[in-house]
Amino acid sequence: MAEDTVLYKKYPLLGLLHTPPPPPHRPPPQCPAAPRKNVCKRRLVNDNEDLHVPLETPRTHKALCVSQTTTPWTVQTTTSTLTITTITKDGTTVTVQLHL
């Protein structure tokens, strides 16, 4: 045993051979899953449908955040944009453009 002590003093790296292995690496706990989104079905436009058809004013049971419109909404589309336009009762033009 005294001989081992001399060897360990002379060659300190020998101590690594008999040390217990480090504990296994544990992956961090996973984040909770995101809540599921409501899935909406896409409606594909037929070639025969007119893309510039005025839509009805949406009906809702809650009060609208903006004043109601005097004209129905109009929808215009291109290959990469969707534009919805309407005019409120006080004459303000509201345009929403979605870039796809």
Curated annotation (Swiss-Prot):
Keyword set, alphabetical order: Early protein, Host cytoplasm, Host G2/M cell cycle arrest by virus, Host nucleus, Host-virus interaction, Modulation of host cell cycle by virus, Phosphoprotein
Superkingdom of origin organism: Viruses
GO biological process, one term: symbiont-mediated arrest of host cell cycle during G2/M transition
Subcellular localization: Host cytoplasm; Host nucleus
Pfam families: Pap_E4
UniProt PTM comment: Phosphorylated by host ERK. The phosphorylation triggers a structural change that enhances keratin binding and protein stability.
InterPro entries: Papilloma_E4 (IPR003861)
Gene Ontology CC terms: host cell cytoplasm; host cell nucleus
Keyword Zinc-finger: no
Keyword Phosphoprotein on entry: yes
Family: Belongs to the papillomaviridae E4 protein family.
Something else known: The major E4 form is first synthesized as an E1^E4 fusion protein from spliced E1^E4 transcripts, such that the first few amino acids of the E4 protein are derived from the N terminus of E1.
Biological function: Contributes to multiple aspects of the viral life cycle including viral genome amplification, suppression of suprabasal cell differentiation and egress of newly formed virions. Induces host cell cycle arrest at the G2 phase by associating with and preventing the nuclear entry of host CDK1/cyclin B1 complexes. Inhibits cellular DNA replication by preventing loading of host replication licensing proteins MCM2 and MCM7 onto chromatin. Within the cytoplasm, associates with host kinase SRPK1, a splicing factor regulator, and inhibits its activity.
Subunit structure: Assembles into oligomeric complexes. Interacts with host CDK1. Interacts with host SRPK1; this interaction may favor expression of late viral transcripts. Interacts with host cytokeratin components KRT8 and KRT18.
Protein name: Protein E4
Lineage start: Viruses, Monodnaviria, Shotokuvirae, Cossaviricota, Papovaviricetes
